[in-house]
Design a protein with these regions (language model features):
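Extended catalytic core of nucleotide-activated donor transferases of GT-like folds
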Residues: 12, 58, 66-144
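A short, glycine/small-residue-rich beta-strand->loop->alpha-helix junction that serves as a flexible
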Residues: 30-42
Length: 354
């Protein structure tokens, strides 16, 4: 009888926490050692949306010496959101809690397989999905209840290989830090690549092949805070992007929001926002320098098609509504919590009847 009463009390506590938004939402974040990273910003934006709406998010990191995102994203993300390290300690996870785990933390899934919490894998980079899984392992076999991804193309890919896990799309939002400049662009070209060797090769090849443009400056966008990144981008007249593994493509959209045209290598999975008239998209990265040269000539002659700028603006407008992003995050979590509460209530009814 005492055990039954104890079980009833535990289930009722879970129901109350879910109904009152007190159930914890653990969001795992990668330590970028102070370097800006769009994938990490996305998770923090989710956390802040939940916190603002009265939910109970907790940002989880691996080590006690976590550098954090204060210097590049904003100190408010460190002070307003609770943080917890898992080094040398276990998470206090209750059945009503939610764990949101980026795909790069897949190695943790076997460790939390038997936890009663609701587990979600957050997939922004499809190339990392299988990296930490053993042959034959799937998300469903490791207790994952849901996947969140950023594009319909990635959803299609995930649906094919993780068939028993429902996938929901939550497109990133481009920060309002990125705005069109008030002054004319300078002779600077922004470069953003996944592999830094591509940046080095691009710049050296360009200067060798087109020495007449040595007066132009290339700016490697690596290692900047969000404010520095946005400020630098506003000064540029062109952006160059190389990232074969990109699942979404944040940098081109940030460039478009600043009114900066983009020349880019089409990734292995082409982003759904990419069209032939909102940028210059090519299949062979070795020819990018030639397209850059052609663009420079057109820019110097004031001969860039105005339609490109119009298409850029309409493209990025679809990813600029922060309110809609915040509402989508909260709606998703709220729906999960409502269903969980209903499930616990059914469980409570059965325990009571027995």
């Amino acid at each position: 009888m005492e055990q039954k009463t104890l079980n009833l009390d535990k289930v009722q506590i879970s129901i109350n926490r879910l109904r009152e938004k007190r159930a914890k939402v653990y969001l795992f974040v990668q330590d970028t050692k102070g370097n800006a990273k769009a994938a990490v910003r996305y998770v923090y934006q989710m956390g802040m949306a939940l916190k603002t709406a009265g939910f109970n998010p907790i940002m989880v990191h691996e080590k006690n010496d976590y550098v954090g995102v204060g210097k590049w994203l904003g100190e408010n993300y460190m002070t307003d959101l609770p943080h917890q390290s898992i080094e040398g300690q276990n998470l206090e996870v209750s059945p009503e809690d939610i764990i949101i785990l980026p795909e790069i933390f897949g190695f943790i899934l076997p460790q939390i397989k038997n936890l009663p919490a609701y587990k979600i894998v957050l997939t922004q980079a499809y190339t990392n999905i299988l990296e930490t899984l053993q042959p034959g392992e799937s998300w469903s076999s490791l207790g994952v209840a849901k996947c969140i991804t950023t594009t319909s193309k990635q959803k299609e890919y995930i649906d094919r290989i993780m068939r028993n896990v429902p996938v929901e799309i939550l497109s990133p939002v481009i920060s309002d830090s990125f705005q069109k400049p008030k002054f004319p662009a300078k002779t600077i070209i922004a470069v953003h690549t996944r592999d830094q060797r591509d940046t080095i090769n691009l710049i050296k090849t360009f200067y060798l092949k087109y020495p007449q443009y040595r007066w132009l400056t290339f700016r490697d966008m690596r290692g900047l805070s969000e404010q520095e990144f946005a400020s630098t981008l506003k000064d540029c007249f062109l952006s160059v992007w190389i990232d074969n593994e990109s699942g979404f493509g944040t940098f081109p959209l940030e460039s478009m929001k600043c009114g900066v045209p983009v020349i880019g290598k089409v990734p292995d999975i082409m982003p759904e926002w990419m069209s032939e008239d909102n940028g210059v998209w090519i299949a062979d990265k070795t020819s990018i320098v030639d397209y850059v040269s052609d663009f420079i000539q057109g820019w110097l002659e004031d001969n860039i098609n105005e339609e490109m700028y119009t298409k850029m603006e309409s493209t990025v407008s679809k990813y600029s509504d922060k309110k809609a992003f915040d509402e989508s995050v909260c709606k998703m979590i709220e729906e999960i919590q409502i269903k969980r509460a209903e499930s616990f209530e059914n469980q409570l009814q059965k325990l009571t009847n027995n």
